[in-house]
A protein has these predicted regions:
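Fold-level signature of zinc-dependent metallopeptidase catalytic domains
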Residues: 1-182
Length: 182
């Protein structure tokens, strides 16, 4: 059902590899291409780990069957993609919060059995969306916290982002109902 569309995604990912910021980002894109070409879930895990551990790029992306919001059982995910770039000034402010994640975990108003003793690998940054695709289009949440895989999060951490230009757009759109007072 998705073969023709995913072939175009792979074609464009191969083109994008030439513009990767570094070898690590080329590896991430390569693993995603390999996953799309094989459908191998082990390769998807390798891609996810490489993606979550690649925290340096100014330009990043999410691409794949990521969120399962539309499936009540949480088993079937829909395809989505976002290409984004880092807002460096806003990220500096967010990194202060990220650096104190353990304090926030320890002092959160949550029952002790749900708290993590050792918060690991939280990479928080502020981004600006350049393009949205799939289930993210035409609008998306104001933040992303991935991967969804609990074992990957526990062993390799997660990426947590706030999408600044969408947050701003949603705030602006809430200032009125769109009608002129005449």
């Amino acid at each position: 059902k998705y073969g023709k569309s995913l072939s175009k995604v792979v074609e464009n990912l191969k083109l994008a590899q030439a513009y990767a910021e570094d070898e690590k980002q080329q590896e991430v894109i390569g693993k995603l291409i390999e996953y799309y070409e094989t459908g191998d879930l082990h390769t998807f895990d390798e891609y996810t780990i490489a993606w979550v551990e690649n925290t340096a790029p100014m330009v990043d992306f999410v691409n794949g069957f990521t969120e399962s919001y539309g499936d009540p059982l949480g088993m079937k995910a829909s395809w989505e993609s976002i290409v984004n770039f880092k807002d460096t000034e806003a990220t500096k402010r967010t990194e202060k919060l990220s650096a104190n994640a353990q304090w926030f975990e320890d002092n959160s108003p949550v029952a002790a059995e749900f708290k993590k003793e050792n918060v690991k690998g939280i990479t928080a940054k502020v981004i600006k969306a350049a393009i949205l695709g799939g289930d993210l289009y035409p609008s998306t949440a104001i933040g992303i916290n991935l991967p969804n895989s609990n074992w990957v999060r526990a062993e390799h951490g997660s990426k947590s982002v706030t999408i600044a230009n969408l947050t701003h757009a949603y705030a602006e759109s809430s200032n009125g109902n769109g009608m002129l007072d005449e």
